[in-house]
From Swiss-Prot:
Gene from which the chain derives: ino80
PROSITE patterns recorded: DBINO, HELICASE_ATP_BIND_1, HELICASE_CTER
Keywords attached to this entry: Activator, ATP-binding, Coiled coil, DNA damage, DNA repair, DNA-binding, Hydrolase, Nucleotide-binding, Nucleus, Transcription, Transcription regulation
Full protein name: Chromatin-remodeling ATPase INO80
Protein location: Nucleus
InterPro entries: DBINO, DEXQc_INO80, Helicase_ATP-bd, Helicase_C-like, INO80/SWR1_helicase, P-loop_NTPase, SNF2-like_sf, SNF2/RAD54-like_C
DBINO domain mapped to chain residues: 570-695
Organism: Emericella nidulans (strain FGSC A4 / ATCC 38163 / CBS 112.46 / NRRL 194 / M139)
Sequence positions that bind ATP: D823, E824, M825, G826, L827, G828, K829, T830
Function according to Swiss-Prot or TrEMBL: ATPase component of the INO80 complex which remodels chromatin by shifting nucleosomes and is involved in DNA repair.
Motif DEAQ box, chain ranges: 933-936
Comment block on domains: The DBINO region is involved in binding to DNA.
The EC number(s) this enzyme carries: 3.6.4.-
């Protein structure tokens, strides 16, 4: 691995320990091509070079500024050490002109340690014991590369035990001294040369000492050693013999001789190149003494020689000397053993690195080959596919032509056979049969060609080369010519070979046999005489000549008719056939001759101009060659420069990648330590609070924090709070970080306590009465025995788990800690919150102010429950318009007010929207307790709602939520951040840990880290209390969930398939990877369209009313007022005789026949005697027996079948109609209707009478009422006002009943409700389900995602006569309470239609025992909240939940994703096992790609996953853009899944009365796949916020609509 670790485990002042390693210096000619960067074989080099090695300029290093820890063993001056730069790529070859990118070098400086100490550990004096460590890699990060030894060991001499393991015996290693060691001659003379090592590697050891004198002198002059290390004359002691080979190592002689001048210059510049020689060797040359000085020296020497001898060499130290020698040998063996281990490790590391290098190069070669040949292979495959397609098309055309040929030839054959059968002439019949046979052969060959069978060639003797039927080897093949045609020559054509007679063939055969026999007998062959054939030929010529001569023939007068016909036929054949052939032949011959002449002329002209070309050819060739050479040279240099540039860029790219990789590793380690610090700090805080609050563990009652109990939680005396940004995660160790986390946690808890005490009244605060020891976090059990009873002012009886929750909330309040009450929905979070307020008022006399913020649909519920359960607490409902709220603020808009029992209000209840609107007023009040109901509304820490609520002055905050995790773990982290903003800061690392390691696990199909889950639960326990129904509420009924799968109907399947075929899933995924807003919006809209089709096709395309086409014009309104006047002039005196008044006569004269018949209707006639026959006694019009002889009115004459009351005779006269009605044919919908209808005939007249009569007939209102039996509106009002019996005024219609009750009198077809139900698979299944539930006495909550679907459901429920009520986002706040109350109190309401978002929060609907989700939400917690409206406290029956899912559609994939989210919530909150969870979800950055995958079917999904794997193997990102401006577009606000599934439904938790907007506009078949009307469409034109689009021409359809006056064209 490359790169250095981000930190060192030891202190900065401590010396680093690295492995000592020095390769042998091979001569430069050893390397291939005399290049010192060539890769070396993986062999183990010699252990150590000479300690005074003078490096070549190619291997020079910068001097180190740090001195060694200890001086050298030989007393020399300490040399500077090399700086410990963690980046190995900047250490090696800094002074040489080497390339600036790393090359593979096995023994270069980048592989060796960079410390300033000895390679064996810390520097020790020569008499100390060696280090006890077996190797020096114990404290080095395994990710750090070994660094160069040459950059390290400049001053400290290295042991040479590994090079020369056999130490010389002590007697041989003893230095040779003078006879008297204390004499001046021995002192002033030069030091005796130490024993040279064995001459194994250096044949000329003397050169090293001679050569190294100059650089050592320079080193002394440039860097003088400290004064404490200057040797004195009296301090010189004999050097131990064992240390001699360890101090010095002679360099190679041949290398010294080759680089003498370079080394001198380099040593002058860099005194630390190599190992500094001891001072006794590096002294300047002696000065020549004068005679006087010499005499003085000799004098003193004589005095010293004559002085008394000392006992330095006296015996008695043999044991110490032996012990010293044994220690030296032991130390040498230890060093040898340690070096052997290091050598093996270096060899292993080097082999691993070499293997990785080979693998990298192999992969790079594979990539280069793929990059170079991929395009050509793709183009070749594409070309082959195109060619194959062309061949296929040709084959199809050829096949069709052959089939047509077979069909035509078969027709010809049949015609020929028919003609042959019909004709009587034998010649004609033979001709037709030949044609039939020819057609049959052609059919046969064509069929063989169709079947792919070729006709085998017949073997014959007429081929150019006869077949070899007798075996043997054929020496040649006839390739030049094709096989001769088997066609016969035409009639009259030349015969290629004359036919022989049988006699000639027999004669030739006999001659051949005779010749063969003669050859076998070696006899001369009998040759036929030449004269005989010649004579025979002459005779034949003579006969022919005589026959051709014009012999005079006597004229015969006889002429035969057949002769003349034959003669004329011959001439006709010649004129018709032969002459055109000869003509064509002559014309072809002439054209060929002319073409040859033209070519000859051209060749001749070229030949004649050759002498001109020959003169200028040399000059032109020279210029051409020069230009060609120049072009080739330019192309060569360009190619060479391009290759060099590419190689340089590649090297730079590799260097940058390696640097980035190293930096990424360092940053990863740093982030890991930072995350560990954050988690440790949080769990320590949670641990302190958990031990303070006994009920923090919920109902589980476990041991809490097990791992933390065992730790020493006592912070040090000097522990102080450290800011997160000030921590150095690279240098600090785990212990220091642990102490810092503990101090920060302690400080956070103490600040929370102090803030709570500062908020309370000092005179009434309970915190002041506590002992100071209670704030000591080492004794947090003082509050463990506090038990709180139920407040007396609370009228309800709390359950056991609710009382436990009250204890937990009170302890949180007294500690000043905020919390999350996350009990499952329906367990009474509201009553627990109310009980806390009652406890504070009763025990601590804290009457407020309390602030309750809830969704708009639950505001009335909060007000009612507080008033019901705690009547002493006054509630102020804060909602309404701005004027109303201003009046309400007069009650609490005071800065300094003390709330008592007599205050005007104690609790203020409002909604989230109003809190944000009036945030400036809420911030002025100091609230004792702020309770947020349905706290998932503040799940985003970036929203203005979250920031506004966080700025309120509150002593404590309490969050109520039944679903703390809805979509991801970041929402839970936002809630924790809200309750403790100082501790749970919004660190990106912590948020990333929550999302990456738990929500969407990075590794495929792996279990969650149990330690991380344990730590997460430990963090959550003190701040969150959660209980589920099945654990704490036994009397609550069970909840059963059932998934009901429905199939797509024919209409749905057609729409679904058509919609999916019109979009390309691959294109959508590729565009989604780019992240363009337009493509994302299109994808969201597509998902919405698919959901519409699954719910009901009428959402996508509503069924239309059909009617025949008619060209008539129908008037909309018509009213006619005709003034009638009656003239009483006495002209109607005759009317008295006809029992008619003047008015009646006037009416009769102005009314038509139908009106007069209508007036007569209902009046009895005088002739009514026949009515007595069939009268019944019970009838009101019956004639009594004693009145039969009275004179009464008679009935009109009627037919017999009309008189009978029972109507049996009428049925006999209308048998067909009766059967039609009894069979039910009259209620069947008509299966067909006329395509067009004729308008009524229009009369055209010059006068007004015809017009008046027509209008009077068409628009006569009384006539219409009489025909259809519908009284006028005024009459109905009078009947109701006067309270009259409507029977006399509601006469039966005079128009007979239509035959079809569905079709009625017209052919207008209204969409059938029965078909409306059966068009949707979900609605058909729901129809069956509701019928069963209605029969069983159940009541239903029906949830929808789209309010448009609720509109359609209202039509269905009206059709089925089910009583229902409705609540969605458009329902006003004041209507919601009444609607819920109606459903709860009226059992006759069967169905409650609700929107999932509007009707799923905070309302109590326990009157229903059945919940049906028509379409599920992608967020499972929303559905859980909705179903818990019925499954909550107060529900005594079992709750059944039905979820309608359309099979094999997008809904199945959405449901699968929702189940994964449910599993995340179960694992994190409930603490369940994570074995069955598939956390292998996609990357969070590619959510749009996941949505696009929902649209694909199984085959497409498998294909997409395969392409993703292939792209991953190539190192690319599937669907990523290749470049372009599209990636640079600025992204606008993202369209989320929430917006997609609930488009236009409005804000359900707002108090606005705006319509939901979810009534999705009806789409037609022409705009499938286009954005719906709910998606904002950019305006057209410039300067209006949209792109300027060109004005397109109108289509023919649009022009016709414009001419017809149909209105808008759709585009506005």
């Amino acid at each position: 691995m490359t790169g250095a670790p981000p930190y060192h485990p030891q202190s900065p002042t401590q010396q680093s320990h690295y492995a000592g390693y020095s390769p042998s210096n091979k001569p430069r000619h050893y390397y291939p091509n005399s290049e010192h960067y060539q890769q070396q074989p993986p062999q183990t080099p010699p252990a150590f070079p000479q300690p005074n090695l003078a490096r070549s300029p190619h291997y020079s290093h910068a001097p180190s500024p740090l001195p060694g820890a200890l001086p050298p063993l030989n007393g020399g001056a300490p040399t500077p050490a090399h700086p410990s730069d963690p980046s190995p790529q900047y250490q090696a070859h800094s002074a040489a002109g080497t390339p600036q990118y790393p090359l593979p070098r096995p023994y270069s400086g980048s592989l060796l340690p960079a410390s300033g100490t000895s390679p064996y550990g810390p520097s020790t004096p020569s008499h100390a014991h060696p280090s006890s460590r077996p190797d020096s890699h114990a404290h080095v990060s395994p990710k750090k590369e070994p660094e160069s030894h040459f950059a390290v060991n400049h001053g400290a001499p290295a042991y040479s035990v590994m090079r020369e393991p056999q130490a010389s015996p002590p007697k041989e290693a003893k230095p040779a001294r003078a006879a008297d060691p204390m004499s001046f001659a021995s002192i002033l003379s030069g030091p005796t040369e130490e024993q040279a090592p064995p001459k194994i590697q250096s044949p000329t050891p003397g050169l090293g000492t001679i050569h190294s004198a100059v650089p050592a002198a320079n080193a002394t002059s440039l860097n003088p050693p400290p004064a404490s290390f200057h040797p004195k004359v009296g301090d010189i002691e004999p050097v131990p013999p064992v240390s001699a080979p360890r101090l010095e190592k002679k360099p190679s002689a041949d290398k010294r001789q080759r680089n003498t001048e370079k080394e001198d210059l380099k040593s002058a510049e860099n005194p630390t190149n190599g190992v500094t020689e001891p001072p006794k060797i590096l002294r300047p040359p002696r000065r020549i003494m004068s005679e006087k000085e010499t005499e003085m020296v000799n004098k003193y020497m004589v005095e010293i020689d004559n002085a008394e001898k000392s006992d330095v060499e006296a015996p008695g130290f043999e044991q110490e000397r032996e012990r010293y020698i044994l220690k030296g040998k032991k130390r040498a063996l230890d060093v040898e053993r340690a070096e052997s281990i290091r050598r093996k490790r270096r060899r292993h590391d080097y082999l691993l690195k070499l293997g990785k290098s080979f693998e990298k190069q192999a992969n790079a070669g594979m990539d280069r080959f793929r990059y170079a040949n991929e395009a050509s292979v793709i183009s070749e495959v594409q070309a082959k596919e195109i060619q194959d397609e062309k061949e296929r098309k040709k084959d199809m055309q050829r096949k069709r032509r052959r089939e047509n040929t077979v069909r035509m030839e078969m027709q010809k054959k049949l015609e020929a056979e028919l003609k042959a059968n019909e004709t009587q002439d034998s010649a004609e019949k033979a001709k037709f049969l030949r044609e039939a046979e020819r057609a049959q052969r052609k059919i046969k060959t064509t069929k063989r060609a169709l079947e792919g069978v070729t006709e085998p060639e017949e073997i014959g003797e007429i081929t150019p080369l006869a077949p070899n039927l007798e075996g043997g080897i054929t020496s040649s093949f006839h390739i030049g010519r094709s096989s001769p045609s088997r066609r016969k020559t035409g009639r009259g054509g030349p015969v290629t070979r004359p036919k022989k007679s049988k006699e000639q063939k027999q004669a030739e055969k006999d001659a051949a046999e005779a010749a063969y026999a003669a050859m076998e007998n070696d006899e001369p062959l009998p040759l036929a005489p030449r004269e005989d054939p010649r004579k025979e030929s002459l005779k034949k010529d003579a006969k022919g000549g005589r026959s051709k001569e014009a012999t005079p023939v006597p004229v015969s007068t006889y002429e035969s008719k057949g002769y003349n016909q034959i003669y004329e036929q011959i001439w006709r054949d010649i004129a018709r056939k032969d002459i055109p052939k000869v003509y064509r032949t002559k014309v072809n011959s002439l054209s060929t001759r002319q073409e040859n002449l033209r070519k000859t002329a051209q060749l001749a002209s070229k030949q004649s101009r050759k002498w001109q070309e020959r003169t200028n050819k040399s000059m032109k060739d020279t210029q051409a060659r020069a230009k060609r050479t120049m072009r080739e040279m330019m192309s060569f240099w360009k190619r060479n420069e391009r290759e060099e540039r590419d190689l340089r860029r590649l090297a730079e790219k590799q260097e940058l990648e390696s640097a980035k990789r190293a930096e990424a590793e360092r940053e990863a380690n740093r982030q890991k330590r930072k995350l560990n610090f954050l988690i440790s700090q949080t769990e320590l805080y949670s641990h302190f609070i958990g031990r303070k609050i006994p009920g923090a563990g919920g109902e589980s009652g476990d041991a809490g924090v097990q791992g933390t109990e065992a730790m020493d939680l006592t912070p040090g005396a000097g522990a102080k709070v450290t800011n997160f940004e000030d921590l150095d995660f690279d240098a600090e160790d785990d212990t220091a970080l642990r102490q810092a986390a503990m101090a920060n946690a302690q400080s956070a808890v103490q600040k929370a306590q102090e803030r709570a005490r500062a908020f309370d009244d000092p005179n009434k605060s309970t915190m002041d009465t506590m002992d100071d020891s209670e704030l000591n976090f080492q004794n947090p059990t003082s509050l463990g025995d506090i038990e709180i009873s139920q407040p007396t002012m609370l009228t309800a009886k709390l359950k056991e788990y609710q009382l436990k929750g009250l204890n937990w909330l009170v302890n949180l309040y007294e500690q000043g800690i905020n919390g999350i009450l996350a009990d499952e929905m329906g367990l009474g979070k509201t009553i627990q919150s109310i009980s806390v307020m009652a406890y504070l008022a009763e025990v601590h006399n804290i009457w407020g102010p309390f602030l309750v913020i809830a969704p708009a649909s639950t505001l009335h519920n909060w007000q009612q429950e507080i008033t019901k359960f705690v009547p002493n607490i006054k509630v102020l409902p804060y909602w309404g318009n701005a004027k109303d709220r201003k009046i309400l603020r007069k009650f609490w808009d005071r800065k300094h007010i003390t709330y008592t029992k007599e205050s005007e209000f104690h609790v203020l209840v409002t909604s989230y929207q109003l809190v944000v609107l009036d945030a400036q007023y809420f911030q002025k009040v100091k609230w004792q307790y702020m309770i947020l109901d349905e706290a998932q509304a503040i799940k985003s820490s970036q929203s203005s709602r979250w920031k506004s609520l966080l700025g309120f002055h509150c002593r404590n905050r309490l969050l109520l939520t039944g679903t703390p995790i809805q979509n991801n773990m970041q929402e839970l982290w936002a809630l924790l951040h809200f309750i403790m903003p100082t501790l749970f800061d919004s660190h990106d690392e912590f948020s990333e840990w929550f999302s990456k390691d738990i929500e969407s696990h990075a590794q495929s199909n792996t279990k969650l880290n149990e330690d991380q889950l344990r730590r997460l639960h430990m963090i959550l326990k003190p701040f969150m209390l959660r209980r589920v129904k099945k654990h704490v509420q036994q009397e609550l009924g069970d909840k059963v969930e059932k998934d009901v799968f429905c199939d797509l109907t024919y209409r749905q399947r057609a729409l679904y398939t058509n919609l999916r075929n019109r979009v390309s899933i691959m294109d959508l995924i590729e565009k989604a990877a780019v992240g363009d807003e337009t493509d994302s919006t299109t994808l969201m809209n597509l998902v919405m369209q698919f959901r519409k089709v699954c719910n009901h096709p009428d959402l996508f395309e509503r069924a239309e009313t059909k009617s025949p086409f008619s060209l008539a014009h129908f008037a909309e309104t018509a009213s006619f007022n005709i003034k009638q006047s009656i003239e009483d002039d006495g002209a109607f005196s005759f009317l008295r005789f006809v029992d008619t008044s003047v008015g009646e006569a006037f009416n009769y004269s102005h009314q038509g026949v139908f009106e007069r018949a209508l007036r007569r209707r209902g009046q009895t006639n005088r002739l009514s005697r026949l009515s007595v026959v069939y009268d019944e006694d019970e009838s009101s019009t019956a004639t009594l027996p004693h009145t039969l002889f009275n004179i009464v009115d008679r009935n009109d004459r009627q037919a017999v079948y009309d008189i009978a009351v029972e109507g049996h005779m009428r049925e006999l006269m209308n048998v067909s109609r009766s059967v039609f009605e009894q069979e039910g044919l009259n209620v069947i919908e008509p299966c067909a209707g006329p395509a067009a209808s004729a308008p009524p005939i229009t009369l055209v007249s010059s006068g007004q009478e015809a017009l008046i009569e027509t209008q009077d007939a068409l628009f006569n209102v009384p006539v219409q009422h009489a025909l259809f039996g519908t009284p006028s509106k005024a009459m109905e009002e009078q009947i109701i006002e006067q309270q009259l019996d409507p029977t006399p005024y509601s006469l039966p219609p005079m128009l007979p009943e239509p035959i079809s009750t569905k079709g009625r009198y017209t052919h207008i077809e209204v969409p059938s409700m029965r078909r409306f139900v059966t068009d949707s698979g979900k609605l058909a299944k729901l129809d069956e389900l509701l019928r069963e539930l209605k029969a069983g006495g159940h009541r239903v909550l029906l949830y929808f995602q789209m309010t448009r679907m609720i509109d359609l459901m209202e039509e269905y429920l009206t059709y089925r006569n089910y009583k229902y009520c409705r609540l969605d986002g458009s329902t006003k706040l004041e209507d919601r309470r009444d609607t819920v109350a109606d459903f709860q109190q009226r059992p006759d309401i069967f169905v409650f239609l609700l929107s999932t978002r509007a009707g799923g929060l905070g309302i109590n609907l326990t009157a229903a025992d059945t919940v049906i989700f028509y379409d599920s939400d992608w967020n499972p917690t929303i559905d859980s909240q909705a179903m818990d409206r019925a499954h909550r406290l107060g529900q005594t029956r079992q709750v059944t939940v039905y979820r309608l899912i359309t099979r094999s559609t997008i809904e199945e994939r959405i449901r699968k994703r929702a189940l994964q989210k449910e599993e995340v919530q179960r694992v994190v909150i409930s603490g369940g096992a994570a074995g069955g969870v598939d956390f292998n979800t996609r990357n969070r950055d590619s959510k749009t790609k996941d949505i696009a995958m929902w649209l694909a079917d199984d085959e497409q999904a498998e294909l997409i996953e395969q392409k993703e794997r292939e792209a991953l193997e190539r190192g690319e990102t599937f669907g990523a853009s290749k470049g372009g401006k599209k990636n640079a577009q600025k992204r606008k606000r993202d369209v989320t899944l929430d917006d997609m599934y609930h488009e236009g439904e409005g804000n359900f938790d707002d108090a606005s009365a705006k319509p939901s907007g979810a009534a999705t506009p009806v789409s037609t078949a022409e705009n499938i796949g286009t954005p719906s009307a709910s998606t904002p469409v950019p305006k057209r034109g410039r300067g209006r916020g949209g792109k300027g689009t060109a004005k397109r021409a109108k289509t023919t359809k649009e022009r016709l609509r414009l001419i017809d006056g149909d209105g808008g064209l759709g585009s506005g």
